[in-house]
């Protein structure tokens, strides 16, 4: 469920040595399954352990996860990175805002999942987003851009070279392409 790098494990062990015996870490998601989802890591003293918590054993400590957060932390990774700017702990949880869908889920659900978990986080850097409007009988995903993508001069490139390539690679034989249904209006909100 959660992968913790060796450097992050060493960092946690160092921090936990300064805590009372039996203290572990807790990884959680606040507002899971929403666009406002936020992940966190905290100390978890023995008296804060719930019987329903999942215990993920690591070297020298356990990682506890509450049942509500668990499905949103599938494929989460925690790393501790040191560079010229210093050190930082990173937690990446690609499913925090939306539960991972099964490989055999309907195509429309799998496309929506990829848009929300992979495409929109990249577009968000420009204040943009994309949503799936419909999936046609001829296997075309009809998309609508919003935010900074609406009216952006790079939207055609983003659609064909970015999103379409990514979706066709993920769903070969199931999807024939993507089309933009957005009525683009250039304005101050447009990224380019």
Curated annotation (Swiss-Prot):
This is Fe/S biogenesis protein NfuA. It comes from Aeromonas salmonicida (strain A449). The keyword Plastid does not apply. Keywords: 4Fe-4S, Iron, Iron-sulfur, Metal-binding. The gene is nfuA. Binds 1 [4Fe-4S] cluster per subunit. The cluster is presumably bound at the interface of two monomers. Pfam families: Fe-S_biosyn, NifU. Its cofactor is [4Fe-4S] cluster. GO terms for molecular function: 4 iron, 4 sulfur cluster binding; iron ion binding. Transmembrane segments: none annotated. One of its GO terms (biological process) is iron-sulfur cluster assembly. Involved in iron-sulfur cluster biogenesis. Binds a 4Fe-4S cluster, can transfer this cluster to apoproteins, and thereby intervenes in the maturation of Fe/S proteins. Could also act as a scaffold/chaperone for damaged Fe/S proteins. It comes from the Bacteria. PANTHER family: FE_S BIOGENESIS PROTEIN NFUA (PTHR11178:SF51), IRON-SULFUR CLUSTER SCAFFOLD PROTEIN NFU-RELATED (PTHR11178). [4Fe-4S] cluster binds at residues 149, 152. Homodimer.
